[in-house]
Structures are given as structure tokens and as C-alpha cells.
UniProtKB/Swiss-Prot annotation:
Role, per record: Involved in protein degradation via the ubiquitin-proteasome system. May act by anchoring ubiquitinated proteins to the proteasome. Plays a role in ubiquitin-mediated protein degradation during muscle atrophy. Plays a role in the regulation of NF-kappa-B activation and apoptosis. Inhibits NF-kappa-B activation triggered by overexpression of RIPK1 and TRAF6 but not of RELA. Also inhibits tumor necrosis factor (TNF), IL-1 and TLR4-induced NF-kappa-B activation in a dose-dependent manner. Overexpression sensitizes cells to TNF-induced apoptosis.
Residues given in the record as Zn(2+) 3 binding sites: 168, 170, 184, 186
Keywords: Acetylation, Cytoplasm, Metal-binding, Phosphoprotein, Ubl conjugation pathway, Zinc, Zinc-finger
Protein name in UniProt: AN1-type zinc finger protein 5
Upper taxonomic lineage: Eukaryota, Metazoa, Chordata, Craniata, Vertebrata
Zinc finger extent (AN1-type): 148-194
Domain notes: The A20-type zinc finger directly binds polyubiquitin chains and associates with the 26S proteasome. The zinc-finger A20-type domain is essential for inhibition of NF-kappa-B activation.
Length: 213
């Protein structure tokens, strides 16, 4: 008999049918289902007093809110009417300076934009003769100068020498007989040229003076 009484009962499933094992302490439900059950009870307990309170106070609160809204609208309409009448009765001198300035600037802009736009006729400019003159002078300057004919006659006897002529330092062309300076009385000064050349090639050497102590 003692053995039969000590035997523990077998595991029982959750009463909600979730498939987990239940516990007799949690009304035969598992821990998860029991927590959900408690949360539902708490939520239902909170909602019920709020619903009753709102149901009892709804008619009076609605009527009071409607009356307040009507009074607010009446006050707004009265204030708007008074402000409009005041604005109509305010003289021009009482307006702020900034508003007067803006009105003056707008009127000036209207006056500037209103004048009729005159159609401007196209102006045709004709080239003046003074402009063409420099171009003609420039063209004349750019024209190549004609080469001077080369001298091919002797300056003394006027004999044709061709390529066998001799140029003198005086700038003339002579034949074989008159190429010497004494034959054609050459005006070029050979002595002065030679003296200048000698001075250039042989500068004067002067010793430095001895400074006495």
C-alpha cells in the first residue's frame, strides 16, 4: 500500500492544447500559456474601468466641448471684424515708414516699365575713305623693292668688264687698267685706315706710376 501511495502521477499536457507539458500549479497550463493568460486578464481589467468612466461622462463632456468651440469661433469672428474695421479707418500717415517706402518703390518701377518702347532703326555704317588710305600705304610699303641693276662698266673708260671688273673701296667698278688708286684718283684715304688699324692692333703700353711712401 505504501508503494502505491508513493507513486507520482504521470506528466500531463497543457490544457490549451499547445503541445507542451502543463503544471497543476499553473492551472494545468504551460509557463508560456499561463503568462499570456495573466496578461489578458490584466488588460481586460484596465480597459473596463476606463470604458465605464468614459461612458458615464461622455454626454456632459461632449456638450461642454461643443459650447467651448462655439464661443471660440464667436470670439475669433469678433476679433477679425474689429481688426478689419481698424485697418480701414487707419489714415495713411499712421502706416509704418517701411510700408510707405515699399509702395513708393513699386510705383516708381511701374512708371519705369510703362513707357512705350521705341523701335530703334538699324544704323548702317559706311566705311570712311580715311580707313582705306592706311591700307593702301601699307600695301605700297610691303611691295618688294626692285633690285638695282649691277654695274658692269668701268667708271673711267666705260668699258664693259662683266665678271672681270674690280670693286674699289670708293664704291666704283673699274677695269684692269684703272683699278689702281693712282689711275682713277681714288678719294679713299688708305693712310688713315692703316693708321687706325695699327693703333687698334698695337695699343700703347704705359707702366704704372710708382707711389712713394
Amino acid at each position: 500500500m505504501a508503494q502505491e501511495t508513493n507513486q507520482t502521477p504521470g506528466p500531463m499536457l497543457c490544457s490549451t492544447g499547445c503541445g507542451f507539458y502543463g503544471n497543476p500549479r499553473t492551472n494545468g497550463m504551460c509557463s508560456v500559456c499561463y503568462k499570456e493568460h495573466l496578461q489578458r486578464q490584466q488588460n481586460s481589467g484596465r480597459m473596463s474601468p476606463m470604458g465605464t468612466a468614459s461612458g458615464s461622462n461622455s454626454p456632459t463632456s461632449d456638450s461642454a466641448s461643443v459650447q467651448r468651440a462655439d464661443a471660440g469661433l464667436n470670439n475669433c469672428e469678433g476679433a477679425a471684424g474689429s481688426t478689419s474695421e481698424k485697418s480701414r479707418n487707419v489714415p495713411v500717415a499712421a502706416l509704418p515708414v517701411t510700408q510707405q517706402m515699399t509702395e513708393m518703390s513699386i510705383s516708381r518701377e511701374d512708371k519705369i516699365t510703362t513707357p512705350k518702347t521705341e523701335v530703334s532703326e538699324p544704323v548702317v555704317t559706311q566705311p570712311s575713305p580715311s580707313v582705306s588710305q592706311p591700307s593702301s600705304s601699307q600695301s605700297e610699303e610691303k611691295a618688294p623693292e626692285l633690285p638695282k641693276p649691277k654695274k658692269n662698266r668701268c667708271f673711267m673708260c666705260r668699258k664693259k668688264v662683266g665678271l672681270t671688273g674690280f670693286d674699289c673701296r670708293c664704291g666704283n667698278l673699274f677695269c684692269g687698267l684703272h683699278r689702281y688708286s693712282d689711275k682713277h684718283n681714288c678719294p679713299y684715304d688708305y693712310k688713315a685706315e692703316a693708321a687706325a688699324k695699327i693703333r687698334k692692333e698695337n695699343p700703347v703700353v704705359v707702366a704704372e706710376k710708382i707711389q712713394r711712401i
